[in-house]
Structure formats: C-alpha cells, structure tokens
Amino acid sequence: MKALSPVRGCYEAVCCLSERSLAIARGRGKGPAAEEPLSLLDDMNHCYSRLRELVPGVPRGTQLSQVEILQRVIDYILDLQVVLAEPAPGPPDGPHLPIQTAELTPELVISNDKRSFCH
C-alpha cells in the first residue's frame, strides 16, 4: 500500500484552482457561468420591484433605493406583528351562540315543502 503525501495533494489542489482562476481571468471560462451574475442581478431587481408592489404605503412614481425598500418591508412586517399580537375584539353584544332550530319561532322555520327556490 502506497502512502500519499498530504503536502503533495494540497499542492496539486492549489495548482488546479490557480489554473482555473487564470483561465477565468483570461476569459476562457466564459459561457453560462459568465452570464450567471447578470441573471442573478435581474432576479434581484425583479424581487425588489415585486416587494415594492406588495408593500402598502410605497408611493408610486417615486424612486426608492433598495435599502429604502427593505426598510419599508421591515416596517410593514413589524406592523403586521403588532396587529397579530393584539387580542381579537369580541362582538359588542357578547359572544355568539349557535341557535338550534327548536329555539326558533314557528314562522322562522322553513318547512320542507317551502325549501324550493324555483317556481
């Protein structure tokens, strides 16, 4: 069984990485990988415009920076958390209880022959 030198293995890995770096720097690595940053930038711009549409209170027609858009999103999320943390208001007359058919007066109960809505 042969023993491998850990130093030599690291050296080969570094050489391989530096050769790839030089190839990319010289432009030999252009292709889908070179187009990736542009598509990512387009995706991020789309996300910022989508956030701008979704958050209420962002004035239309004014130019906001990405930081300002994010700050408005954060403020909106905090406002939603405050609203959700508040107890839900109860009905003003007290709690609603289900009404049984037997508790209704006879004129309010619809008989089976009157349930037809068509003439």
Curated annotation (Swiss-Prot):
It comes from the Eukaryota. Residues 28-80 form the bHLH domain. Pfam families: HLH. GO terms for molecular function: bHLH transcription factor binding; leptomycin B binding; protein dimerization activity; protein domain specific binding; transcription corepressor activity; transcription regulator inhibitor activity. Expressed abundantly in lung, kidney and adrenal gland, but not in adult brain. Induction: By phorbol 12-myristate 13-acetate (PMA). It is found in: Nucleus. GO terms for cellular component: cytoplasm; nucleoplasm; nucleus. The keyword Acetylation does not apply. GO terms for biological process: cellular response to leptomycin B; central nervous system development; circadian rhythm; epithelial cell differentiation; heart development; metanephros development; muscle organ development; negative regulation of DNA-binding transcription factor activity. Keywords: Biological rhythms, Myogenesis, Nucleus, Repressor, Transcription, Transcription regulation. Homodimer, and heterodimer with other HLH proteins. Interacts with COPS5 and COPS7A. Interacts with IFI204. Interacts with GATA4 and NKX2-5. Interacts with ANKRD2; both proteins cooperate in myoblast differentiation. Interacts with CLOCK and BMAL1. Transcriptional regulator (lacking a basic DNA binding domain) which negatively regulates the basic helix-loop-helix (bHLH) transcription factors by forming heterodimers and inhibiting their DNA binding and transcriptional activity. Implicated in regulating a variety of cellular processes, including cellular growth, senescence, differentiation, apoptosis, angiogenesis, and neoplastic transformation. Involved in myogenesis by inhibiting skeletal muscle and cardiac myocyte differentiation and promoting muscle precursor cells proliferation. This is DNA-binding protein inhibitor ID-3.
